[in-house]
Amino acid sequence: MLAPGGGPEQRSKLVLQWRQVSWITCWIALCAVEVIPACPFSCTCDSRSLEVDCSGLGLTTVPPDVPAATQSLLLLNNKLSALPSWAFANLSNLQRLDLSNNFLDQLPRSIFEDLVNLTELQLRNNSIRTLDRDLLQHSPLLRHLDLSINGLAQLPPGLFDGLLALRSLSLRSNRLQSLDRLTFEPLASLQLLQVGDNPWECDCNLREFKHWLEWFSYRGGRLDQLACTLPKELRGKDMRAVPMEMFNYCSQLEDENNSAGLDAPGPPCTKASPEPPKPKPGAEPEPEPSTACPQKQRYRPVSVRRAIGTVIIAGVVCGIVCIMMVVAAAYGCIYASLMAKYHRELKKRQPLMGDPEGEHEDQKQISSVA
């Protein structure tokens, strides 16, 4: 509403101001559209935490329009079974990725190639059976890795190379039977390791990993449980409680197998020796060198009863020695106290007994005076 008596100049000024305000409002709206990225369909986005939540939507593919500035991407509880190598391309700012509770059976080698700032990776409860050794080489800042509840039977050597910042690793509920110590050597910052609910075979193949576990526990690392499944004598027993002498046979077995392959030079051994040629009539057959392969000794697990018996015998011997030392010390103390008491009583009796030689000299002096 114009004030009464306003002229055309005042009207034109008001119209001009109104146009300026409209232009400024439109410009702000356009800037807001450019700054705030579009959110993928059916997903929930938080512009403050830069989190995109696409969990529980029944997705079979990763949404292609995830904003490049996303720092947290949640894709758990979906139906993802196969992912292309470019599924997370251009998401270099991503720090947290959750792919739990899906149907993934394998991961392309370069699927995490652009995730250089990734610090947390959740792959729990999938169907992953194998992992490429270079899968995590482009994520050196990774701190938390969860591979539990999958079908992993082994870990490729070099899988954890370069993961110096990794603090927690979960390998629970897989099909792991043994682990290589060299695979875990690069994990200098590891604080928590979960390996429970795996069919561990506590034999020679797990000896070196047991050494690494002792070092890991010594520097303050936490381990849930590593219960043996085989051999049956150790079933249910924690690997850390198995005495090291149970693995003494492993070194002997390796030495015997190595020496079997370093015998005197001769023809190469074969599994089935060829039939000797038929001798000529009237000629004596010449003995031929044996080409049979020496049979390697199979690993025979040391009896748990024998190991426990050795420990018990050693404890009994040590106990007897300690008891003998205590008895000897007590006997010495008693003997010393008795001797001290005897000397005290002897000193008390000496003034009462008198000196017979002194009395004899006194009698001589008296007789000479008389």
Swiss-Prot record:
Glycans are attached at N90, N117, N125, N257. Residues 260-297, 351-370 are annotated as: Disordered. It is found in: Membrane. Residues 36-68 form the LRRNT domain. The chain crosses the membrane at residues 307-327. It is a single-pass type I membrane protein. InterPro entries: Cys-rich_flank_reg_C, Leu-rich_rpt, Leu-rich_rpt_typical-subtyp, LRR_dom_sf, LRR_TM_domain-containing, LRRNT. Keywords: Glycoprotein, Leucine-rich repeat, Membrane, Repeat, Signal, Transmembrane, Transmembrane helix. Pfam families: LRR_8 (PF13855), LRRNT (PF01462). LRR repeats lie at residues 69-90, 93-114, 117-138, 141-162, 165-186. Residues 1-35 form the signal peptide. Its main location: membrane. Residues 36-306 are extracellular. GO terms for cellular component: membrane. Residues 198-252 form the LRRCT domain. Residues 328-370 are cytoplasmic. One of its GO terms (biological process) is positive regulation of synapse assembly. It comes from the Eukaryota. PANTHER family: ANTIGEN BSP, PUTATIVE-RELATED, LEUCINE RICH REPEATS AND TRANSMEMBRANE DOMAINS 2. This is Leucine-rich repeat and transmembrane domain-containing protein 2. The gene is Lrtm2.
